[in-house]
Amino acid sequence: MTVSRIISLAPSATATLAAAGLAERVVGVTAHCELDRPTVGGWLNPDYEGLAELSPELVCTSDSLQGEIHEELKARGYNTFHHEPSRLTDVLEGFESLPKAAGAAAAGRELRESAERRLTAVDERVEARLAEGASRPTVYCEEWSDPPMAAGNWVPDAVEAAGGRYPFVTPGERSQEVDREIIEGVDPDHAVLHICGTGSQVSVDRIHNREWAVEPAVHVFDDSLLNQPSPHLIRGIEQLSRRLYPE
């Protein structure tokens, strides 16, 4: 069944729908989403009355933090799509399953296949550089700074896909606090700041001003490029790989 009225309560779902060519079906979003649509509250505090006024045929949520919201939506009788990715493979699966839930299975397959082709291209470039004698660098990704948190979930997979090593968090596990001893013990070659909710408005001094006896190359990424389980993540992997293996 084709769904023509979708409300997205997750920025990742909004970005995925847009990338699949379904933006015109989205009639409502949160204040954190990219599409210019009527807003129905925030990520963790939806406006249920405003949502009802838009008469959605499908409401999208994401992450365990929206689990209770998802259950409330079901209790109110809404048709829902809920996705809780923890690995890169889960993110790719969502590229296909979300459009399918909206009645656009072909668009979902193409979106996933396109992402997989892009990841293959990254892998081939990395393998070529390694064959030329390049070393696989160690990367530290920080999604929060107070206290410093090493990014988890799909980020370890993303770093590996970009050609890096990521010994801070096991793939699929939640982000973990790190301290000076941990960072100095690893001595990363690169540090990536992708602080939640800041976009790219972060200074490299967040690393330089700490009394860590390490000297990584520091990069600032828009937080959506690594934190958001959407097609933005694929672009983040491509950009990270180019930083790790510059021409």
Regions found by a protein language model. Name each.
Residues 1-247:
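N-terminal ligand-binding lobe of clamshell/alpha-beta domains
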